[in-house]
Amino acid sequence: MASQGTKRSYEQMETGGERQNANEIRASVGRMVGGIGRFYIQMCTELKLSDNEGRLIQNSITIERMVLSAFDERRNKYLEEHPSTGRDPKKTGGPIYRRRDGKWVRELVLYDKEELRRIWRQANNGEDATAGLTHLMIWHSNLNDATYQRTRALVRTGMDPRMCSLMQGSTLPRRSGAAGAAVKGVGTMVMELIRMIKRGVNDRNFWRGENGRRTRIAYERMCNILKGKFQTAAQRAMMDQVRESRNPGNAEIEDLIFLARSALILRGAVAHKSCLPACVYGLAVASGYDFEREGYSLVGIDPFRLLQNSQVFSLIRPNENPAHKSQLVWMACHSAAFEDLRVSSFIRGTRVLPRGQLSTRGVQIASNENMETMNSSTLELRSKYWAIRTRSGGNTNQQRASAGQVSVQPSFSVQRNLPFERATIMAAFTGNPEGRTSDMRTEIIRMMENSRPEDVSFQGRGVFELSDEKATNPIVPSFDMSNEGSYFFGDNAEEYDN
């Protein structure tokens, strides 16, 4: 990984800040989540939500989506230029759930976008507070990552469903900025680039003219973002070739798919942040907590602390298991959809199950679902230990690319060895080794063949007691390494549909 000298920390990206010292970063991240909390409290007042209704995660998501929609300038412009009947482009809305006579009822609210922008700015000292909006987008993205599998999207772009662990952030909107780019997985970036190249192949004018020049700049920027995620020289050199191609086409798509496969062992560096639902920040602000004064970090103990004493509810469908629903949201809160289940289980203190064994569907409730049979239950979001979130793919300190598992992108920087079936992965490389990038391909394959599953990732990094906020006494967990620890492995989760 490049030294911190050349990279802003992702806390800085998150807050759009220039270089700051640790205290300034903690303060500006605190200001950001405090603003989200103040906004949420104000919205609960506007919508006349009771305490319990304000703690309902479905209401939180609706309120978050409304403010994101209010600030989506490109879409708002599009809606005003292409008016559709029965839809007011100046309004946005969604389902709000209220408790009436011992039942949950759904009420569709409509809100003026201008009014939402006003309330948001007012909660954020009059600023647009784009960082807070991005934070909400990342929370929604992490929730999608934990809930849905992207097999169909992978197959559509010619990638392999086994690469699902590379798909972090695949539902993030384009406008999510540097903080969004930091949390996107290698597979997500590859998929965006392939879609772009395919458009260029099918549409002669895609790269031409004034628009084409802008497209080209976007293409090269995306290539550089992806290059920055790779940790070996050969992978980066291959990205340079993809970026410099005069007329990107099938050869580039081949190279990108090859690189995505290589990332199953030579892991990319992908950031992880604990982004919590707005209602959690709202509860803390309402109880008098001053985030900006106390400081806050998305990658340390703070989110764990916040979840230890927040009570959040969720609607539960008749045949869903509340414990499973809790696990889903816990994973989303800690951006742990692609983490090794054994690591997650150890930190959480209860067994974390693979997606296919969970009796729960997504958190959001469709408008045609019957509310009569809906119950609600408290989400169990507490943990036994905390661990520092990582932005590395889990490499050994010898800076040799270490083994990664077909199905894991570490979220927590906790020592473990990553078992993987080399045969499974290498089988994906029976392909053409010729072409412009043959020497790089050969080198990448050689590195993959030499990587040893028993190499330890994050040497010496452990988990910490919740009382150990300065991370002074690491506890290095020992894992049963005999079984695959992947969440989506051999799975039947629903697909994500926009």
UniProtKB/Swiss-Prot annotation:
Span(s) of short sequence motif Bipartite nuclear localization signal: 198-216
GO molecular function, one term: structural molecule activity
InterPro entries: Flu_NP
Any one GO cellular component localisation term in the record: ribonucleoprotein complex
Keywords: Capsid protein, Helical capsid protein, Host nucleus, Host-virus interaction, Ribonucleoprotein, RNA-binding, Viral nucleoprotein, Viral penetration into host nucleus, Virion, Virus entry into host cell
Residue ranges annotated as motif Unconventional nuclear localization signal: 1-18
Chief localization: virion
Record PTM: Late in virus-infected cells, may be cleaved from a 56-kDa protein to a 53-kDa protein by a cellular caspase. This cleavage might be a marker for the onset of apoptosis in infected cells or have a specific function in virus host interaction.
GO biological process: symbiont entry into host cell; viral penetration into host nucleus
Subcellular location: Virion; Host nucleus
Protein's UniProt keywords contain RNA-binding: yes
Region (Disordered): 1-22
Subunit structure: Homomultimerizes to form the nucleocapsid. May bind host exportin-1/XPO1. Binds to viral genomic RNA. Protein-RNA contacts are mediated by a combination of electrostatic interactions between positively charged residues and the phosphate backbone and planar interactions between aromatic side chains and bases.
HAMAP family associated with the record: INFV_NCAP
Function: Encapsidates the negative strand viral RNA, protecting it from nucleases. The encapsidated genomic RNA is termed the ribonucleoprotein (RNP) and serves as template for transcription and replication. The RNP needs to be localized in the host nucleus to start an infectious cycle, but is too large to diffuse through the nuclear pore complex. NP comprises at least 2 nuclear localization signals that are responsible for the active RNP import into the nucleus through cellular importin alpha/beta pathway.
Family named by the database record: Belongs to the influenza viruses nucleoprotein family.
Protein name listed in UniProt: Nucleoprotein
Organism: Influenza A virus (strain A/Gull/Maryland/1815/1979 H13N6)
